[in-house]
């Protein structure tokens, strides 16, 4: 009651904001007479003037009134369109990083030119995001005339563009493109092997057209780049034939070619084993024995395959670790004994086991990179959006994206008549009424737009209209070019257009048809008389349609979201035109059935209601809207729930991508490698010779074997300790560290500093990328089963955060170990070899991308809704939480032993 009273006195927040913006509109209007007097050259000179003022530190908000006035005058001169006052308000809302709700026909495309022009003056790039390629190209071509006239460059990005053209488009002041293309290019940039391979120059400011469609409707499913793994199935088979000839050692120092670390599930080749394996691989034709060895740089893939094959033969046993069923290797869960259908071991192990068992070696499709639109667009420093329907989702925009919705008043009052819903007993009665309404409108020359929720319904209606002899168009949303043409002509007298609810957005339905399209069809050589004749003919049609009642909207079913229904209604009544709308429903429709439609249907039949009888009451409409609100709230919970999970992945993605950027930008990564090497060697030594331990606790032979197998170092630590009995654990660690550093220094001296720097950078990038891809697969597996923790009285989200952090920490440690191991063992003779290696890697990366699938779909073959429902169901089973361990205070020492406070270490994930 108090809120209502305050609103009546001071106005709503929306009204207060509009009052503030109207004051700035008055300033812009006051500048108009002065700006109008400027010559074209003087007006164009304003752009470099503004740029200089901004470069000198003047805020954009200070430049805004003058910049908007210049853009408005340029629009009048170049496009023949002058921005209305309400369009100036819309432009300011977009500049402020908010969402402008503007009704259909209010000129959103023209509105965007104001904030785009102003923000492009900073020189950091502005992205204008549309829902399809056709609209991106159309808007870039139309509005590009204005921007180019004002001295700004415009680019448009679309799938399949040449690399140089796309880089140029992103380097422009203003770049148009679809949400998918901006997202995929962001992912591609974070798979690039050099700075020159990247497209984008940072995510600075974006204006999202149809923002509700992109940030809400498409928010639940991620963009995924997936492709076949690099491994060749043939190479697995060839290497598999070599492994049976290698002999297993009974002990670490025994005779043979390799020994097995049962606990770590690893296999290590001895020095003799390396020579024997190299000989066998040469005999098999896999290696060229005259010019290359097993650990030559170009043979790292062969080493990877050999290790996988050794593990498959020596560690993984049939009918224990896996079974063979229907020609496939199926993993057996070591704890439950159940088969894990659909799961595959990573790192090439599964293919190696398939080769061992003689079943077809499958080439995996691996997720190379993924991101959700929620996380993509939240990375922009400033984000804004436009749509005709955002107010119903204002809470979600605010809570997830921090975007406030401002409803912009229409330039002219809306006079469209929205009739109450008509509810029928069943679908047959409903569609009979729909067909009768369409035929009646067609007879009196009133255009009709029929909105359906499925292609099946569209085709059924089309069939009935054809039988009745009613001419009509069915809009296929897959053909964007044709879609725009059909929608542009949907306002002609008597036109009947059947479309799915979302089709045709971005193109206005003009009463009488599109005059602009007709004039364009005349061609550039058309005379003034021809143009005048076309305009006169259009004017007659325009008046005829207005007299018939304007565009009539027929909705054949209520959508789950009120916003989608409002979008359909909003196609009619643009710019103060007449229009009407009505929804026809049946108690069998999905929305009504879920909320008790079947029960009501039985009751109505008992009361004698017939098929052709209709319920028409405002109360019914309100009840339906109440049902829609319930569904909207449920869908919001799903999206919010999924975002909580995605945020964990996103935090990790940011760390990895930041590390990649640092590597790509760095001239040298020597300091990074030196630091990593020290950490890795310290950890390796500590495993066999623990700090502050006595010599009885040392495993010097194990340390020697590991240094030899992993780092190619031969050190007789046993003899060293015998000679120097005073050596303690710290001294041994120092000796090993000294020897490793000497080994790296010798390698650098033999190949040259420049070659070594290039190799270090290449190895770090390659290992990081490969580890990240494998980590994504592990995260997918974790996520698919995490909801089951709810049945064990644990919170799935907290469990996911905890285990994801552990997986990520393990991955980072493995990256360090792998980098040092590869750099220790790789043999490089010249700079040309490194360049050849980088060229081969780049070629492989390009091949991966060319074979990749660019998807906007659900991950893992199950829907996002199902996953969220499973999580929610599991969480409902969570009773009062019982801790497995005592609670750790935020200022207590972290139990991991790092010495840091819990809040600064693992507590950061809480």
UniProtKB/Swiss-Prot annotation:
Q: Where is the composition biased (Basic residues)?
A: 900-910
Q: List the SUPFAM superfamilies hit by this protein, alphabetically.
A: Helical scaffold and wing domains of SecA (SSF81886), P-loop containing nucleoside triphosphate hydrolases (SSF52540), Pre-protein crosslinking domain of SecA (SSF81767)
EC number from the UniProt entry: 7.4.2.8
Region entry Disordered, spans? 848-910
Comp. bias (Low complexity):
869-880
Q: Which residues bind ATP?
A: 87, 105-109, 508
Q: Which InterPro entries match?
A: Helicase_ATP-bd, Helicase_C-like, P-loop_NTPase, SEC_C_motif, SecA, SecA_CS, SecA_DEAD, SecA_motor_DEAD
Q: What is this protein called?
A: Protein translocase subunit SecA
| Organism for this UniProt entry | Stenotrophomonas maltophilia (strain K279a)
Its gene name is: secA
């Amino acid at each position: 009651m108090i809120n209502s009273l305050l609103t009546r006195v001071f106005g709503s927040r929306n009204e207060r904001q509009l009052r503030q913006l109207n004051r700035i509109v008055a300033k812009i209007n006051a500048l108009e007479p002065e700006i109008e007097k400027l010559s074209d050259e003087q007006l164009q000179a304003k752009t470099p003037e503004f740029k200089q003022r901004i470069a000198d530190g003047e805020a954009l908000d200070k430049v805004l009134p003058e910049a908007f006035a210049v853009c408005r005058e340029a629009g009048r001169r170049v496009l023949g369109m002058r921005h209305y006052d309400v369009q100036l308000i819309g432009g300011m809302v977009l500049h402020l990083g908010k969402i402008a709700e503007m009704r259909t026909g209010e000129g959103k495309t023209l509105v965007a030119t104001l904030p785009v022009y102003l923000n492009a003056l900073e020189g950091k790039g502005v992205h204008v995001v549309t829902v399809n390629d056709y609209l991106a190209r159309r808007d870039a071509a139309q509005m590009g005339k204005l921007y180019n006239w004002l001295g700004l460059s415009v680019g448009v990005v679309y799938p399949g563009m040449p690399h140089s053209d796309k880089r140029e488009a992103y380097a422009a002041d203003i770049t148009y493109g679809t949400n998918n293309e901006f997202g995929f290019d962001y992912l591609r940039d974070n798979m690039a092997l050099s700075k020159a391979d990247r497209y984008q120059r940072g995510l600075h400011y974006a204006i999202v057209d149809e923002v509700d469609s992109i940030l809400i409707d498409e928010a639940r499913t991620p963009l995924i780049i997936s492709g076949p793994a690099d491994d060749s199935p043939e190479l697995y088979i060839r290497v598999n034939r070599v492994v049976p000839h290698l002999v297993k050692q009974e002990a670490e120092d025994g005779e043979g070619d390799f020994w097995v670390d049962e606990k770590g599930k690893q296999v290590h080749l001895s020095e003799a084993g390396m020579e024997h394996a190299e000989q066998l691989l040469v005999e098999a034709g896999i290696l060229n024995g005259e010019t290359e060895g097993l650990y030559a740089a170009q043979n790292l893939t062969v080493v990877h395959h050999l290790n996988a094959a050794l593990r498959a033969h020596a560690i993984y046993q049939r009918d224990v670790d896996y079974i063979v069923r229907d020609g496939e290797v199926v993993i057996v869960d070591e704890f439950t004994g159940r088969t894990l259908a659909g799961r595959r071991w990573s790192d090439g192990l599964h293919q190696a086991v398939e080769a061992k068992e003689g079943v077809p070696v499958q080439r995996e499709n691996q997720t190379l990179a993924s991101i959700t639109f929620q996380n993509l667009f939240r990375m922009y420093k400033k984000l804004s959006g436009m749509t005709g329907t955002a107010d119903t989702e204002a809470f979600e925009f605010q809570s997830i994206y921090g975007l406030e919705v401002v409803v912009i008043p229409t330039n002219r009052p809306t006079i469209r008549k929205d009739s109450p819903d008509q509810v029928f007993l069943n679908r047959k009665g409903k569609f009979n009424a729909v067909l009768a309404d369409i035929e009646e409108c067609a007879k009196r020359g009133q255009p009709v737009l029929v909105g359906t929720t499925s292609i099946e319904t569209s085709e059924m209606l089309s069939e009935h209209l054809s039988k009745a002899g009613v001419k009509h168009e069915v809009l296929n949303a897959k053909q964007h070019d044709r879609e725009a043409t059909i929608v542009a002509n949907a306002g002609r007298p008597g036109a009947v257009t059947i479309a799915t609810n979302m089709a045709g957005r971005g193109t206005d339905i003009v009463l009488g048809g599109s005059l602009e399209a007709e004039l364009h069809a005349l061609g550039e050589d058309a005379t003034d008389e021809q143009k005048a004749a076309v305009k006169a003919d259009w004017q007659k049609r325009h008046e005829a349609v207005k007299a018939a009642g304007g565009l009539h909207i027929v909705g054949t079913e209520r959508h789950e979201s009120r916003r989608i229904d409002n979008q359909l209604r909003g196609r009619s009544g643009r710019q103060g035109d007449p229009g009407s709308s009505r929804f026809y429903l049946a108690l069998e429709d999905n929305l009504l059935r879920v909320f008790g439609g079947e029960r009501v249907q039985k009751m109505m039949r008992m009361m004698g209601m017939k098929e052709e009888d209709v319920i028409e009451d405002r109360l019914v409409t309100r009840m339906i809207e109440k049902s829609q609100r319930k569904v909207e709230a449920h869908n919001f919970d799903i999206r919010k729930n999924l975002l909580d999970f995605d945020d964990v992945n996103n935090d990790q993605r940011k760390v990895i991508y930041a590390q990649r950027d640092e590597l790509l930008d760095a001239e040298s990564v020597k300091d990074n490698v030196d630091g990593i090497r020290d950490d890795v060697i310290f950890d390796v030594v500590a495993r066999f010779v623990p700090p502050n331990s006595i010599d009885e606790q040392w495993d010097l032979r194990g340390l020697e074997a590991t240094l030899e197998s992993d780092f190619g170092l031969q050190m007789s630590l046993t003899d060293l300790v015998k000679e120097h009995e005073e050596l303690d654990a710290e001294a041994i660690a120092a000796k090993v560290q000294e020897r490793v550093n000497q080994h790296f220094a010798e390698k650098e001296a033999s190949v040259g500093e420049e070659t070594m720097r290039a190799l270090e950078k290449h190895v770090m990038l390659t290992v990081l990328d490969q580890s990240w891809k494998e980590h994504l697969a592990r995260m997918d597996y974790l996520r698919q089963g995490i909801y089951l923790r709810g049945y064990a009285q644990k919170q799935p989200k907290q469990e996911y955060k905890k285990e994801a952090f552990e997986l990520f920490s393990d991955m980072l440690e493995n990256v360090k170990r792998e980098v040092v191991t590869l750099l220790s063992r790789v043999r490089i003779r010249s700079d040309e070899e490194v360049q050849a290696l980088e060229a081969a890697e780049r070629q492989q990366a390009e091949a991966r991308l060319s074979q990749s699938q660019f998807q906007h779909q659900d991950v893992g073959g199950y829907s996002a809704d199902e996953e969220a429902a499973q999580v929610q169901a599991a969480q409902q089973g969570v009773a009062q939480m019982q801790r497995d361990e005592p609670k750790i205070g935020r200022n207590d020492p972290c139990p991991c032993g790092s010495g840091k406070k819990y809040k600064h270490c693992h507590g950061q994930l809480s």
